[in-house]
C-alpha cells in the first residue's frame, strides 16, 4: 500500500513540475492539462490510422506520404476494395467525432479540423461511386507511374523495380475500368482519353530508363517485354476512353450545388453561400478587367501622343508618353486586347542552359527580395530539373514538395524544356520563358512562391504539413507574385501587363469553376463566357473548363487564398504603420502553415503575441 502511495506522490510531483503555472492557482486545473494531453495523443493516433488506411487501400497516395513500401503498387479499383476502405474510414470518422475538441491544446484544434475534414472528403469521394461513373478515377494510375520519375525515393535499383511493377499493374487498371465503368460522362471520358494519350506518348521515357539501367542482357530483355506490354495497355485504354467519349446521352459532368459546396467546405475550407460565391466571382472579374485596362495603358499611346523632352545635359531628346485621359465610356478590355499587344511585343527567350539559368535567376531574386525586406534571407540551392514528358504535355512547370516522410526530402521544381526543331523550340521558349513570363514563374513558384514557402515550412508538425489546406497554398503563389511586384522585381510595363493578365485569367477561371458546378453554366455557356464575353482563345478556354471539371474548387481557391493574405497584410500595415516589417509578416504567416483561411487571422494574432 505504501508503495502505491509513494508512486502516486511521485506522479503528482512530476506533473506539477511540468505545469508549474497551476501550482499557485486551482490545483485541479492540472487534470485539464492531462485531458488535453490525452486528446492530443488520440489525435495523433487518428492521424496514424488515416495513414495506415492510405497505405492499405490507396498505395498511390501513400507514395506521396513517403511510404516506400507502397511504391510497387497501384490502387485496386474494385467494389470490394472501396467497401472495405469506406468501412475503415467511417470507423475513423466515428473515432474523430467522439474526441472532445474543446479539450485540445490550442495548437491541435486546427490540426483536428484538418484531419476531420480530410476524412469527410475521403468518405464523400467513395460514396460518389467513381468506380462506375468517372474515367478520370482510372487515369490517376498514370500519375502514380510518372510520380516515381519526379523523386529519388530510394536506391536506384529499387526505384526502377517500383517503376516496372507499377507499369505492369496498368493491365489490371485497364481491366478494372472495362469491368466497372457504366455509361460515364462523355466529357470526363474525353479528358481521360487525353491523359491516356499523353501517358502513351511519354512512356518512351519510362521504357528507355528501365532498359538502359538494366543490369544485364536478360534483365534488359525482360524490361523490353514488360514496357511493350505496358504501352499496349495504355493504347487499349486510350481506345476504350475514346469510345466512351463518343456516347451521345451521358450523365452530367458537373458536381451540382450540394456536392460542390461540400468540396469547398471540406477540401478548401471555403464556406460562402452560392449567391455569395457568384457575387464574389463577378466582383473579382470586374476588378481584374479594370487592372488589365490600367496595365494596357502604356502600350496604347500612339506616336502623336508622345511628348518630346529636351534633356538639360544636351543629349538626344527622348519621347515620353503623355498621360492619357481614360475614356470612361470605353468598354473594359478583355483577353483579346492582351493578345493583340502581346503579339506586337518583340518577345524573345534563350534556350541555352535553361535549368541552370532559372536556378541562378531564382537565387538572384531571393537576394534582391531579401535586400528589399520582402522576405527573409534565403540561400538555396534551388533544385531545378527537366519536367518529365507526361506532365510537360499538360503544363509548363510543376513544383513538387517532399513526399511526406521521404528519407532524403527534396523540394523540386520542374520546367518544360522546348522540344522539336529549332523553330519549334524557339516558339515554345518564347511562350513559356520570355522575360516577363519567367519572372512570374520564379516569383509564384520559386521565390517567394511555393519553393521558398515549402522550405520555410519544413519544421511544421505532421498533420499541418501533410494535410494543409490548398486555399492558402495556392493563394500564397498569387500573393508571392504581387509581393515581388511591390518590391520591384516585377517592374517593367511588360511585367505588369503579364501579371494583370494572369490575375484576369485566374478571375475568369474562378468564375467558370463557380458557375459551372453550381449549375449556372453548361459547357457551351462556359465556352461562350470565356471566348466571346472575355476574349480568351479557344484553346485557353478549353484548358480552363477542363481544369475546373477535373479539380472542382481549385481555381476558386487561388483568389480566395490571395484575398485572405492580402487583407491581413493590409490590416497589419495599417495597424503598425512605420513599424511594419514585410519580411517578418511573411515569415510569421509561413510559420503558421496552410490552415483554414478563416482561422488565419487569430493564428497570426497569436504569432505576433508569442514572438515579440
Each language-model region and where it sits:
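Sec/Tat signal peptide C-region and signal peptidase I cleavage site
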Residues: 19-23
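Bacterial N-terminal signal peptides
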Residues: 9-17
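N-terminal maturation segment of proteins
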Residues: 24-612
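Bacterial N-terminal signal peptides that target proteins for export
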Residues: 1-8
Amino acid at each position: 500500500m505504501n508503495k502505491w502511495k509513494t508512486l502516486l506522490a511521485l506522479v503528482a510531483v512530476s506533473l506539477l513540475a511540468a505545469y508549474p503555472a497551476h501550482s499557485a492557482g486551482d490545483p485541479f486545473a492540472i487534470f485539464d492539462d492531462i485531458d488535453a494531453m490525452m486528446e492530443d495523443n488520440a489525435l495523433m493516433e487518428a492521424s496514424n490510422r488515416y495513414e495506415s488506411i492510405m497505405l492499405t487501400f490507396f498505395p498511390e497516395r501513400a507514395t506521396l506520404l513517403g511510404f516506400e513500401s507502397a511504391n510497387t503498387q497501384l490502387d485496386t479499383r474494385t467494389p470490394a476494395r472501396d467497401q472495405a476502405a469506406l468501412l475503415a474510414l467511417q470507423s475513423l470518422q466515428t473515432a474523430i467525432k467522439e474526441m472532445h475538441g474543446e479539450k485540445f491544446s490550442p495548437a491541435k484544434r486546427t490540426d483536428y479540423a484538418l484531419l476531420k475534414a480530410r476524412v469527410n472528403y475521403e468518405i464523400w469521394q467513395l460514396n460518389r461511386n467513381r468506380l462506375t461513373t468517372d474515367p478520370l478515377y482510372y487515369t490517376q494510375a498514370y500519375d502514380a507511374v510518372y510520380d516515381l520519375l519526379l523523386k529519388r525515393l530510394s536506391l536506384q535499383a529499387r526505384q526502377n523495380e517500383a517503376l516496372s511493377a507499377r507499369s505492369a499493374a496498368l493491365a489490371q487498371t485497364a481491366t478494372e475500368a472495362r469491368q466497372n465503368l457504366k455509361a460515364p460522362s462523355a466529357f470526363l471520358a474525353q479528358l481521360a482519353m487525353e491523359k491516356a494519350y499523353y501517358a502513351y506518348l511519354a512512356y518512351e521515357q519510362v521504357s528507355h530508363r528501365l532498359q538502359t539501367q538494366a543490369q544485364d542482357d536478360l534483365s534488359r530483355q525482360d524490361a523490353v517485354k514488360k514496357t511493350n506490354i505496358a504501352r499496349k495497355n495504355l493504347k487499349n485504354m486510350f481506345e476504350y476512353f475514346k469510345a466512351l467519349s463518343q456516347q451521345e446521352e451521358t450523365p452530367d459532368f458537373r458536381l451540382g450545388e450540394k456536392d460542390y459546396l461540400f468540396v469547398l467546405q471540406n477540401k478548401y475550407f471555403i464556406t460562402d453561400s452560392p449567391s455569395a460565391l457568384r457575387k464574389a466571382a463577378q466582383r473579382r472579374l470586374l476588378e481584374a478587367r479594370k487592372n488589365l485596362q490600367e496595365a494596357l495603358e502604356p502600350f496604347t499611346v500612339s506616336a502623336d501622343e508622345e511628348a518630346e523632352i529636351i534633356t538639360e545635359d544636351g543629349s538626344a531628346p527622348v519621347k515620353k508618353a503623355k498621360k492619357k485621359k481614360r475614356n470612361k465610356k470605353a468598354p473594359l478590355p478583355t483577353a483579346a486586347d492582351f493578345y493583340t499587344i502581346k503579339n506586337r511585343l518583340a518577345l524573345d527567350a534563350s534556350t541555352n542552359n535553361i535549368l541552370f539559368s532559372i536556378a541562378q535567376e531564382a537565387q538572384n531574386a531571393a537576394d534582391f527580395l531579401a535586400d528589399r525586406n520582402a522576405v527573409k534571407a534565403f540561400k538555396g540551392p534551388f533544385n531545378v530539373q527537366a519536367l518529365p514528358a507526361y506532365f510537360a504535355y499538360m503544363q509548363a512547370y510543376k513544383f513538387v514538395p517532399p513526399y511526406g516522410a521521404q528519407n532524403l526530402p527534396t523540394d523540386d521544381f520542374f520546367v518544360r524544356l522546348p522540344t522539336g526543331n529549332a523553330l519549334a523550340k524557339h516558339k515554345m521558349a518564347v511562350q513559356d520563358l520570355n522575360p516577363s513570363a519567367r519572372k512570374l514563374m520564379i516569383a509564384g513558384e520559386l521565390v517567394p512562391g511555393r519553393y521558398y514557402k515549402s522550405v520555410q515550412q519544413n519544421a511544421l508538425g505532421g498533420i499541418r504539413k501533410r494535410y494543409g489546406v490548398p486555399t492558402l497554398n495556392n493563394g500564397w503563389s498569387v500573393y508571392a507574385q504581387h509581393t515581388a511586384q511591390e518590391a520591384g522585381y516585377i517592374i517593367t510595363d511588360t511585367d505588369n501587363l503579364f501579371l494583370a493578365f494572369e490575375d484576369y485569367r485566374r478571375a475568369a477561371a474562378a468564375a467558370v469553376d463557380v458557375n459551372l458546378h453550381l449549375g449556372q453554366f453548361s459547357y457551351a455557356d462556359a465556352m461562350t463566357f470565356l471566348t466571346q464575353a472575355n476574349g480568351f482563345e479557344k484553346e485557353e478556354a478549353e484548358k480552363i473548363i477542363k481544369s475546373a471539371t477535373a479539380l472542382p474548387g481549385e481555381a476558386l481557391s487561388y483568389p480566395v487564398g490571395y484575398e485572405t493574405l492580402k487583407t491581413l497584410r493590409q490590416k497589419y500595415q495599417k495597424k503598425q504603420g512605420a513599424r511594419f516589417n514585410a519580411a517578418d509578416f511573411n515569415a510569421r504567416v509561413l510559420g503558421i502553415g496552410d490552415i483554414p483561411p478563416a482561422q488565419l487571422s487569430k493564428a497570426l494574432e497569436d504569432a505576433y503575441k508569442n514572438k515579440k
